[in-house]
């Protein structure tokens, strides 16, 4: 069994959401069905990043860290580098 830390991006708003889940697909569906108070106003959501952990405690610790200001800066830097690198390599897919 894996435990997941994930990042959702609102399709219509400039918002990110960081969460924890045991069943990642089910949890994303719950977000997009409006079943989460925190994400309901910013529907729909798409997953842009996730990490899998074998240990629940490690996953929850990572989620908590990414929600701090320091963790948020790290996450934004990682995402920026990832999307920049994939954008600059998109010509390789043609």
Residue ranges and their predicted role:
Residues 1-43, 47-50, 58-68, 72, ...:
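GIY-YIG nuclease catalytic motif and its immediate N-terminal context
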């Amino acid at each position: 069994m894996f435990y997941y830390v994930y990042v959702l991006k609102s399709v219509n708003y400039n918002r990110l959401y960081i969460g924890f889940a045991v069943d990642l697909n089910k949890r994303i569906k719950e977000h997009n069905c409006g079943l989460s108070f925190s994400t309901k106003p910013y529907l729909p959501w798409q997953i842009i990043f996730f990490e899998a952990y074998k240990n629940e405690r490690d996953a929850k610790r990572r989620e908590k860290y990414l929600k701090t200001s320091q963790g948020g800066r790290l996450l934004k830097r990682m995402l920026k580098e990832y999307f920049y690198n994939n954008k600059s390599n998109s010509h390789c897919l043609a």
